[in-house]
Amino acid sequence: MKKITGIILLLLAVIILAACQANYIRDVQGGTVSPSSTAELTGVETQ
């Protein structure tokens, strides 16, 4: 049972990391200097 929950947690972590990275890449490609709501949620600080 513990092995199953571990696998589920690992999958969730990977999905969340991938989503955050996709948001960050999209913000960078957009070329906007102002921080977006996604950047604030993920804790990414823009200069």
Swiss-Prot record:
The keyword Membrane applies. GO terms for cellular component: cell outer membrane. A lipid is attached at residue 20 (N-palmitoyl cysteine). Residues 1-19 form the signal peptide. InterPro entries: Lysis_col (IPR003059). GO terms for biological process: cytolysis. A lipid is attached at residue 20 (S-diacylglycerol cysteine). It is found in: Cell outer membrane. It is a lipid-anchor. Keywords: Cell outer membrane, Lipoprotein, Membrane, Palmitate, Plasmid, Signal. It comes from the Bacteria. Lysis proteins are required for both colicin release and partial cell lysis. This is Lysis protein for colicin E6. It comes from Escherichia coli.
